[in-house]
Amino acid sequence: MNPRTILAFDFGTRSIGCAIGQELTGSARPLQSFKANDGVPDWQQIEKVLREWQPDLVVVGLPLNMDGSEQPLTQQARKFANRLHGRFGVQIALQDERLSTVEARAHLFAGGGYRALEKGRVDAASAALILESWFENQYR
C-alpha cells in the first residue's frame, strides 16, 4: 500500500484553513488560509493548492455542537465538501472538528503569545489538528 497524501480544510464563512499530511507518518502541518465570502472561497486558489499537492484524499472538518448535533455551519461545510468533489473530482472525507480551533489557539498562544493568534494561522493550525484527528480515527 502506498502512503497517501491528504489535504484538510477547516471550513469557515470568512476564512478556510488548509493543511497537508502524510498517511505514512500520521502527521499534518498547516499550509495557509483562504479568505471566503460567506463560505465561498476563491476557487482558483483552492484549485492551485490541489494541483500543487495532488492529494489522494481531502478531509473537511465538520463543525458540530458539543453534544454532536448539527448547527447551521455544518450544512455549509457539507456543501463546501460537495463542491470540492464536484469541481475537482477529489475523494472527500468528513471529520468532526469540535474544539479544533480552541486547541489551535492554545497551541499557537503557547508558542508565541497574542501575536501568534493571527486568524489565518489559527485556521491553518485548526486544519492540521482536524487532519491529525482523522489519522487517529483511521488507526485505532
Swiss-Prot record:
One of its GO terms (cellular component) is cytosol. GO terms for biological process: rRNA 5'-end processing. Gene3D superfamilies: YqgF/RNase H-like domain. Keywords: Cytoplasm, Hydrolase, Nuclease, Ribosome biogenesis. It comes from the Bacteria. CDD domains: YqgF. The keyword DNA-binding does not apply. Its EC number is 3.1.-.-. It is found in: Cytoplasm. Belongs to the YqgF nuclease family. HAMAP family: Nuclease_YqgF. This is Putative pre-16S rRNA nuclease. It comes from Edwardsiella ictaluri (strain 93-146). The lineage of its organism: Bacteria, Pseudomonadati, Pseudomonadota, Gammaproteobacteria, Enterobacterales.
